[in-house]
């Protein structure tokens, strides 16, 4: 595409950040082929368990995972998904080994955590919120740097575990082809931010 400001890519976490790290060959190089214009959305995940689970908070989940290495399961939206990487990051930063169970999206992982087929799931806040608000799921933590206004009593991972630096969010933004003039990018950014 011509770098003239008339071609705009709606970029997101999967194809523009995860895929380049996971797949050896892609027909594009996000860092070389595109220039960011603006970040328009950040969507945190919620670490959830069934409401009737004996696990009451994230610290208890980590303690259980330390006591039973590899026996605690976390569901994700699929191999290489943002929720998969968020779960692995949690395991690494907490110093535990949890068993990853990949699903084809958030909905099947939520079904299995509700049925206690898995211990926890990491859906996006958009997917998990209805079940949390209805009381069917217990939110253990949010994966953003700050608490969610819609779940003010649910701590961040950092708060729950007393660590620093955990953040795992899905995101969306606009990019243009590399070579687009800075004047066009600045104008687009200004318009998006109005």
Features from the language model and the residues they span:
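Conserved helix-loop-beta element of the AMP-binding
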Residues: 35, 61, 136-149
């Amino acid at each position: 595409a011509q770098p003239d400001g008339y071609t705009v890519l709606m970029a997101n976490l999967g194809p523009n950040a995860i895929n380049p790290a996971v797949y050896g060959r892609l027909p594009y190089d996000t860092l070389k082929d595109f220039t960011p214009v603006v970040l328009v959305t950040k969507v945190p995940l919620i670490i959830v368990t069934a409401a009737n689970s004996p696990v009451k908070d994230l610290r208890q989940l980590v303690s259980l995972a330390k006591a039973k290495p590899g026996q605690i399961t976390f569901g994700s939206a699929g191999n290489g998904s943002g929720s998969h990487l968020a779960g692995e990051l949690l395991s690494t930063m907490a110093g535990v080994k949890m068993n990853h169970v990949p699903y084809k999206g958030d909905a099947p992982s939520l079904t299995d955590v509700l049925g206690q087929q898995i211990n926890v799931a990491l859906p996006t806040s958009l997917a998990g919120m209805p079940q949390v608000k209805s009381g069917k799921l217990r939110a253990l933590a949010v994966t953003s740097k700050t608490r969610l206004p819609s779940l003010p009593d649910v701590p961040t991972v950092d708060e729950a575990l007393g660590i620093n630096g955990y953040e795992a969010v899905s995101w969306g933004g606009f990019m243009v082809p590399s070579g687009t003039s800075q004047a066009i990018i600045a104008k687009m950014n200004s318009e998006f931010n109005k």
